[in-house]
A protein has these predicted regions:
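Secondary-structure capping and boundary motifs in well-ordered enzyme cores
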Residues: 5, 17, 121-125
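Generic structural signal for short, solvent-exposed loop/turn connectors between secondary structure elements
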Residues: 5-7, 30-36, 140
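His/Asp/Glu-rich, glycine-adjacent segments
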Residues: 41-141
Length: 141
């Protein structure tokens, strides 16, 4: 997790390809310091259900299922498979002794993007901000 003396924003763009990142990264650099711009490969499945839950829980998917079975839905089960991400992150922060002021926003629908823009100060005020943007949907903002 990030250093406690720096404000940090994690921008997680779901369904985002590396070539898309390369095309917009220069625009973001005017507003944010990009600490690292590397390409990584991992054994973690990249399907949204697995990847995003693992990122926020700090656990592999099988461990999430074993530790919190009431918060994990398998592929064959109906329901939202990423509905506990903020809860997973709170748990991870507590386990690591991080008592940061944080904000967590998911942008799936256009009105969620507009609401975030209207309340952007909460992102600036937080020690750690997470913005999850689902690129698979129509443009949010």
């Amino acid at each position: 997790m990030c250093s406690s003396d720096l404000k940090t924003t994690l921008l997680l763009i779901d369904n985002f390809r590396y070539d898309q990142w390369r095309s917009i990264s220069s625009l973001l650099r005017g507003y944010y310091d990009v600490a690292q711009d590397d390409f990584y490969c991992a054994i973690l499945p990249t399907a949204t259900q697995y990847a995003r839950n693992a990122i926020f829980a700090g656990l592999m998917p099988l461990a999430i299922d074993k530790l919190m079975p009431n918060k994990w839905l398998n592929d064959n089960e109906e329901g939202g498979k990423n509905q506990y991400e903020e809860e997973f992150l709170k748990r991870l922060m507590a386990q690591n002794g991080k008592n940061w002021k944080f904000s967590f926003d998911k942008l799936v629908r256009p009105e969620q993007g507009r609401k975030l823009v209207d309340n952007i100060q909460k992102v600036y005020d937080a020690d750690f901000s997470v913005i999850v943007y689902n690129l698979d949907r129509k443009s949010v903002v």
